[in-house]
Amino acid sequence: MDPRSEVLLRQRHLFAAPTLLAGLPADDLLAELPLAHGWSWHAGEQAQLDARFPGRSRFDTRAPVGAWSAAVVFLPKSRELADYLLASLAARLPGGELFLVGEKRGGIERASKQLAAYGRPRKLDSARHCQLWQVQVEQAPAEPDLLALAQRYSLPLADGELQVVSLPGVFSHGRLDRGSALLLEHLDDLPKGHLLDFGCGAGVLGALVKRRYPASRLTLLDVDAFAVASSRLTLAANGLDGEVIAADGIDGAPRGLAAIVSNPPFHQGVHTDYQASERLLQRAAEHLAAGGELRLVANSFLKYPPLIERHLGPCRTLAEGDGFRVYTARRP
């Protein structure tokens, strides 16, 4: 059981009425709270919840409609996303109770101040290195417009400006990260055909690839609903076509790909987690056509080349700078 869920269950009497759990983990919490429903934006966790609790959790960027007496936000890493979640739920709960739960190392003490916009926050519990806060919604806001919260910026590239649209919670929100900046400079001579942007975030890599190789088919994949929505907005802002899918890792990707480009993720909430990246390297060959290429950027300290060579083929370093390296390998 996730420690945040354990803290909630210490106060389970507060959640005996219909309660919405925003960002809930894929554990036994829904079994323990029979009137609760989930709101998830993580495709992998949603799949697990669907398998165990059919119809009791929704995958979306917007809060599900329901007659909730209370709502709980599991504190995300992004402050902007936390603001959006709290405002979305406070708008649905005039006079109701809004809870915030999170790990101390994830910043719950600081984040609890975000509740003050809706009433007087109270700390209800502290256990398992987590805290539970509550506020009665005295000042219900208007429901936030997610698109109005998007950050838009332009990248001046050699073949023209690229427009990027980033929603709260997306990696490197509102700016280009250093790893992607390096990879953007080394996307020449990709094989033509079906191309995949794995862990697409706001869709920067995929949009450039589609513009540079317009005859190629493009798929973008991310585990996060806000990233999927951002990538669709980025493609639309540049007048580009592409399929954007939500999936938990490379196992959800198409097969027969000509190339995979990626700045692979290595965070899950506040925790470092290389599982999705390592699985990409281990399984890329299963999704690439013969002669297909994997081209990715990663922190220089990560020992990816031996893993790539073990599972795909000879690995070359195309570029290095600012603490990152661009690697390439082809399926035989």
From Swiss-Prot:
So which domain of life are we looking at? Bacteria
Tell me the GO molecular function terms.
16S rRNA (guanine(1207)-N(2))-methyltransferase activity; nucleic acid binding
Where in the cell is the protein located? Cytoplasm
Gene3D superfamilies, per this entry?
Answer: Vaccinia Virus protein VP39 (3.40.50.150)
Q: What class of enzyme is it?
A: transferase
Q: Which GO terms describe its cellular component?
A: cytoplasm
Task: Provide the reaction this enzyme catalyses.
Answer: guanosine(1207) in 16S rRNA + S-adenosyl-L-methionine = N(2)-methylguanosine(1207) in 16S rRNA + S-adenosyl-L-homocysteine + H(+)
Q: Which CDD domains match?
A: AdoMet_MTases
What does the subunit comment say?
Monomer.
Q: What does this protein do?
A: Specifically methylates the guanine in position 1207 of 16S rRNA in the 30S particle.
Provide the family line.
Belongs to the methyltransferase superfamily. RsmC family.
Q: What is this protein called?
A: Ribosomal RNA small subunit methyltransferase C
Q: Which organism is it from?
A: Pseudomonas paraeruginosa (strain DSM 24068 / PA7)
Upper lineage: Bacteria, Pseudomonadati, Pseudomonadota, Gammaproteobacteria, Pseudomonadales
